[in-house]
């Protein structure tokens, strides 16, 4: 069952949490980067509106919005500007989003954070109800990452999804011919070997996945040159400094991935999210962001599953 044919829980959350007509002119002042529902709920309302509505993961909060947590629920909110993060729990509710100081809006770190927040807030997320067919063992093998676009050469790992006990072959092809070929692969990932020919920045490579003699998936990617990679690393360091030392690890990962994705580095953004999930597997925002990345790279079924997981974790009581 595709994303267009299922109930879109997160879309409903985002729409019902919207402020009245005219609120679109308000600046984004914060974003929910973590949700811990516990036995309670995280709710939001716009300025001048009486009703509280459910707040979902990665919800962009406009200046003037109020956020509250009930019972033992809590949310982490990253603030625009160099203001770090705030944990909103019942004792700190309601929390009203304020505008960042005017003098921060010309700082590079502010603009970088705005780019990340803009990407994270621009994705219309559709979350299906649990569907057993999406987890069928009969699904075809598919390359998960990279899937087009630029990649950083120092973190290049090929990942795919296939049958549990099957063996696969990977081939990297340049315009001049085959650069790398590995067969008999089990598992689901292969780091680019250190003894393989170095990939040339700016060259369009084709990654092919084979099952037996059949090519089952194929994508293109490009390694960025060192100056561009160094610029990106410098920007990520500035974002880290702008967030401050007290931002929780998962929220930091969300913002780093948002900045990477806003610059087109979807492979590296996914790498950051997957790494964060190894230590915080129950965080709805990480699953929602993973769904965003899958949706943007042409993997609707994988996006469905990630959104489904985000929905279940953000609101365990919902059927």
How does the language model describe each region?
Residues 121, 126-246:
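Long, contiguous interaction/recruitment modules in multidomain scaffold/adaptor proteins
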Residues 23-157, 232-233, 266:
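Flexible, surface-exposed loop/linker segments and immediately adjacent secondary-structure boundaries
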